[in-house]
């Protein structure tokens, strides 16, 4: 796996985050290279104010910080940590870090965007750029050519302004735009709806997974969250908008709830949804993190988990494996990990490898999903029992 980015006589050493010894995925892609090549050809004067949005692991921030003032904007905690580590390893100049809910800096000279997977997130970003940027400020976005549709360009034209595209290079294409769309459209960051069949209302910020309706996996999982007075602490790992935590809190009014996600927008949404649906005075914590890094071992009774199988645009199962390994460390003895996943992902084999064959059981299944329960080191029953 390549870790050296070599362009224009310069070299950067770049790693994904967290760094793994058997890593098979690069920390940058051809889209990053296309952006770098194009901006270098622009021959900008030094000390420009460049905003970089959705820079997966900091390749763009590292490159442009040598001569310019860079602001890194991302909704991803993992991207923030990856960029910070790569900046440090390459001894780069200081970069400002913001989330995509923060305001775009007003004195921006150039905006570079790796297009997000979510159209809601894209519309939010475009609307914020239109609100702040002067017309003369170039906005250059990149993605795989097959992911840039006519509908994508129409969103640019509607929410940002005049838009055109480049020729394809290494299966990627650039999108050129500027902030001149009229009229300027205000975008509400919150999408709210009721969960059918539940006493739950959810508010979703733009980059929340399945933010416009409840995904089928979560709907199935809601039916199998336990009600158990012996449970003191529940962790919702990869919490999204917090719907599973809300249900767990309704069923277990005295439980301590910890929501963990790598999306800052997901955590803000979960925090608001828990407050709205459970009220004040509950023992609730929302944590931006890479899985369960830094959590105290043997400190939790139940972990609920719906693992993602993407990291940015890459398909990977290493996040699920890290979640399962972390969960085993954090669970108390006899603590339980409740996992939902698509049937084809084979989580049962992974969990049995980690927890032991006899400690993993099927809780429920339908034609698309399975819910599995893994128990940590079940205590042996005494002879009297």
From Swiss-Prot:
Entry-linked Pfam families: MTS (PF05175)
Main location as per UniProt: cytoplasm
Residues passing through the membrane, by range: none
Positions of disulphide bridges: none
InterPro entries associated with the record: rRNA_m2G-MeTrfase_RlmG (IPR017237), RsmC/RlmG (IPR046977), SAM-dependent_MTases_sf (IPR029063), Small_mtfrase_dom (IPR007848)
Subcellular location: Cytoplasm
Keywords tagged on the record: Cytoplasm, Methyltransferase, rRNA processing, S-adenosyl-L-methionine, Transferase
The EC number(s) this enzyme carries: 2.1.1.174
Entry similarity comment: Belongs to the methyltransferase superfamily. RlmG family.
Alphabetized PANTHER family for the sequence: RIBOSOMAL RNA LARGE SUBUNIT METHYLTRANSFERASE G, RIBOSOMAL RNA SMALL SUBUNIT METHYLTRANSFERASE C
HAMAP family on file: 23SrRNA_methyltr_G (MF_01859)
Full protein name: Ribosomal RNA large subunit methyltransferase G
Originating organism: Vibrio parahaemolyticus serotype O3:K6 (strain RIMD 2210633)
Lineage: Bacteria, Pseudomonadati, Pseudomonadota, Gammaproteobacteria, Vibrionales
Gene of this entry: rlmG
């Amino acid at each position: 796996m390549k870790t050296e980015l070599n362009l224009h006589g310069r070299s950067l050493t770049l790693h994904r985050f967290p760094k793994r010894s058997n890593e098979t995925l690069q920390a940058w892609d051809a889209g990053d290279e296309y952006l770098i090549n194009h901006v270098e050809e622009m021959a900008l004067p030094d000390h420009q104010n460049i905003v970089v949005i959705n820079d997966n692991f900091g390749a763009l921030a590292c490159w442009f910080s040598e001569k310019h003032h860079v602001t890194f904007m991302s909704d991803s905690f993992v991207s923030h940590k990856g960029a910070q580590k790569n900046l440090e390893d390459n001894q780069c100049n200081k970069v400002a870090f913001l989330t995509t809910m923060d305001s775009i800096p007003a004195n921006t000279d150039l905006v570079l965007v790796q297009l997000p997977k979510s159209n809601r997130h894209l519309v939010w970003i475009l609307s914020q750029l239109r609100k702040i940027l002067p017309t003369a400020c170039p906005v250059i976005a990149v993605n795989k050519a097959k992911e840039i549709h006519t509908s994508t360009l129409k969103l640019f034209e509607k929410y940002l302004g005049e838009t055109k595209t480049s020729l394809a290079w290494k299966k990627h294409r650039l999108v050129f735009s500027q902030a001149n769309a009229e009229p300027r459209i205000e975008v509400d960051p919150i999408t709210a709806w009721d969960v059918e069949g539940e006493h739950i209302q959810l508010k979703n910020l733009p980059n929340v997974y399945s933010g416009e309706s409840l995904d089928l996996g979560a709907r199935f999982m809601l039916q199998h969250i336990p009600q158990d007075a012996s449970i003191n602490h529940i962790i919702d790992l990869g919490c999204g908008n917090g719907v599973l935590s809300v249900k767990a809190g309704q069923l277990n009014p005295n439980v301590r709830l910890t929501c963990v996600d790598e999306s800052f927008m997901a955590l803000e949404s979960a925090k608001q949804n828990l407050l709205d649906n459970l009220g004040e005075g509950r023992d609730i914590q929302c944590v931006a993190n890479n899985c369960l890094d830094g959590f105290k071992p043997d400190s939790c009774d139940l972990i609920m988990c719906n693992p993602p199988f993407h990291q940015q645009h890459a398909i990977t199962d290493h996040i699920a494996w890290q979640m399962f390994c972390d969960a085993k460390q954090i669970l108390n003895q006899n603590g339980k990990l409740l996992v939902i996943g698509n049937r084809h992902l084979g989580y049962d084999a992974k969990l049995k490898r980690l927890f032991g064959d006899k400690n993993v059981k099927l809780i429920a299944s339908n034609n698309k999903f399975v819910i599995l329960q893994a128990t940590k080191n079940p205590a042996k029953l005494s002879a009297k029992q």
